[in-house]
Amino acid sequence: MTARPKVRPGKRTNDPEGLRKRVLDVAEASFQARGYHASSLGDLMAAAGVTGGALHHHFPTKKALALAVIEERVAAAVEATWIAPVQAAGSAREGVRSVFEAVAAELEQQGFVRGCPLNNLAHELSLADPDLRAALAGIFSAWRQAIADKVRADQQAGRELDTDPQRFAALAVATYSGAMSMAKTAQDSGVLRDCLNALGQGASPASSSKGEAVAKRRRRVLRQYKAF
């Protein structure tokens, strides 16, 4: 009985992780440019150059693919664009301003506005599926929390003592989201700078105190009218 020659295992030619990344790249771009509902699996497979079997091995359903795009790509975009810069800034206000200005400058150089990746999908999918909505809401929550935590850090250093961290964070996120929606519609990144200036005026401690004073006067007037 002769010994069989040893056979070296052949070099692996397939790349599951590379394939998965390619599908995510294509899906992310299509969902942002065309929308989730307008992006068919057939179109995505053709653009990625994969078979149905290969696609479904990684993403059994279109919803699973959307969740992966949201949890891996959109969350990473918010982390890189917003959370990390705010955390690294000297203060929450400085961080928010730097993000607005950086995004506006990038859009001006780019020449077009595709919108906020999170905002785009939130508008389309929040009422379409509870799991997709929960994934999107989780990113919004982490975004607001990061800004609020930065305000609290400022307060520990003796700054922003008259600022409510959660309200400031909600206002910053809402202002940016709205500004990006308007900039996308108008194809004009200048809206971001306008909204940043308004945010600076409306979110300052002095403005907040003035607003509270106005609200108190309004309540007093209403009570006087009720007395008649």
Model-derived regions, located:
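Hydrophobic alpha-helical segments that form the core
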Residues: 114, 119, 161-182, 194, ...
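Short hydrophobic/aromatic patch on the recognition helix
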Residues: 48-59
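Hydrophobic alpha-helical connector segments
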Residues: 68, 82-114, 165-172
